[in-house]
Amino acid sequence: MPLTKIEVCKRWLPVQVQTIIEAVYLAQREALKVLEGDRQIRFVEHCPEHFHIPAGKSGNYTVVEINIFLGRSIEAKRALYKAIVRNLGRVGIDPSDILIVLHEIPLENWGIQGGVLASEVDLGFKVNV
């Protein structure tokens, strides 16, 4: 159940936004074995005054921040990063313009299904992939 935020400064066309969201979602499905339809992804476009692009980066600079349950393996994380970069490359975003940050949060720090601790719920999938 990743909770994902994609932040950009560039204005993308609506169809491009959906393609970017889909690219990140498919990477999560592939690498983290996320359930089909488990798509909690927000796309945030900032105005230039509110988003500093680091030196050496282009206007396509993209930050992908993902909150996930604690427990994914290094191999799964590596596969996730590679899949995100590959998929976003198909949209025209250069690998050097992509920053990915994972926040691993223990199950007891997620309130789901009406505020129940995620550690007390049958999630329907394995976290330790």
Features from the language model and the residues they span:
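Interaction-mediating elements
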Residues: 1-129
